[in-house]
């Protein structure tokens, strides 16, 4: 662009120079006297020449401008292509970077997995090392024991054979009475075991001669006999133990123990005394000749704050309590005493029941009414004794005949008011 402007200036400068030169030329002419027609023609020619030159210069300048614009357009087109190429290369670089990031993530995952596996392998290697160290220690111990056995010449090899087993006499055990004897017996058993182990043949069956085969047959027969004897002894011992366990004495002892646990000895003696027919309770001198009487009459004065109805209810409550105590003692006696004693008690109860029935028939005739105030405690004692004995007899009758109804003694109170 700068060069084109300089060239345009050059084209303009010569035209201006020509114009300057042309007007200077007529300056000397005034000395001469030219004609005015000639002067007009020369000026017109000069103007035409200047116009032609200006048109040419403008045309050339326009051509140059067109060329310059074409060049600029080409340069811009090239720049656009280069920019497009740069954008494609940048996109390719971005794709490569994304691929690299993906590869890096996958490699990081694989590296983490490898690290975990390496840790596990290291843990396994440590465990293996520990096991190997333990095995080395055990091997060293075995080597030491082996060396000691070889030095002592006590190296033994035991081969299990179904036909030739260890004799049963070695395994027979007797009861140990004391600690010292037990130690001696253990030492003897160990010696016998060692002897039998030494006697075991280690050679194969092919190398044995016929005489040794005969000896083995005899040994097998002896072993079978010893086994049969063992089985017989064990069975006899078991039978004896069962007989002892289920003997009558052991059962009686166990029953007595259970009875003592349920009922104490003192209580049992009291129950026995109460069941014996010859046993008689102490009674007052003024009592009736018959022990059991279903009817009894007593007299009491009515004191202050008490009524006849309250006295009757109290006496009935006492009668019920006595009956409950009698039935409870009889139940305990049946649970604690053995079968033989229970049979005897049942017979005694039958006898006493019969006596009670007989006495009940005759006691209806003897009814005493005491009216003296001084004999009131004696009458109370008699009434309590009659209640106790009648309750006992009724309980015995209930044991023999549960279907019969209980006969309650009728207590009749005669209250006198002064």
UniProtKB/Swiss-Prot annotation:
Pfam families: PTRF_SDPR (PF15237). The modification Phosphoserine is found at residues 27, 35, 37, 51, 203-204, 218, 283-284, 287-288, 293, 296, 327, 336, 359, 363, 390, 396. Keywords: Acetylation, Coiled coil, Cytoplasm, Lipid-binding, Membrane, Phosphoprotein. The modification N-acetylglycine is found at residue 2. Residues 61-87, 126-268 form a coiled coil. The modification Phosphotyrosine is found at residue 388. Residues 2-168 are annotated as: Interaction with CAVIN1. GO terms for molecular function: phosphatidylserine binding. It is found in: Cytoplasm, Cytosol; Membrane, Caveola. One of its GO terms (cellular component) is caveola. Residues 62-100 are annotated as: Leucine-zipper. Induction: Up-regulated in response to cardiac hypertrophy and in serum-starved but not in density-dependent growth-arrested NIH3T3 cells. Down-regulated within 6 hours after the addition of serum or epidermal growth factor to serum-starved cells. GO terms for biological process: plasma membrane tubulation; positive regulation of transcription by RNA polymerase II. Disruption phenotype: Mice show loss of endothelial caveolae in lung and adipose tissue but no effect on the abundance of endothelial caveolae in the heart. Residues 275-287, 355-366 have a biased composition (Polar residues). Heart, adipose tissue, lung and endothelial cells (at protein level). Highly expressed in kidney and expressed at lower levels in liver, spleen, thymus, stomach, intestine and uterus. Residues 220-238, 303-321 have a biased composition (Basic and acidic residues). Residues 1-42, 200-238, 262-382, 396-418 are annotated as: Disordered. The N-terminus is blocked. The modification Phosphothreonine is found at residues 196, 368. Component of the CAVIN complex composed of CAVIN1, CAVIN2, CAVIN3 and CAVIN4. Binds to PRKCA in the presence of phosphatidylserine. Interacts with CAVIN4; this augments the transactivation of NPPA by CAVIN4. Interacts with CAVIN1. Interacts with CAV3. Plays an important role in caveolar biogenesis and morphology. Regulates caveolae morphology by inducing membrane curvature within caveolae. Plays a role in caveola formation in a tissue-specific manner. Required for the formation of caveolae in the lung and fat endothelia but not in the heart endothelia. Negatively regulates the size or stability of CAVIN complexes in the lung endothelial cells. May play a role in targeting PRKCA to caveolae. Binds phosphatidylserine (PS) in a calcium-independent manner. PS-binding is inhibited by phosphotidic acid and phosphatidylinositol. Does not bind phosphatidylcholine. Belongs to the CAVIN family. The leucine-zipper domain is essential for its localization in the caveolae. This is Caveolae-associated protein 2. The gene is Cavin2.
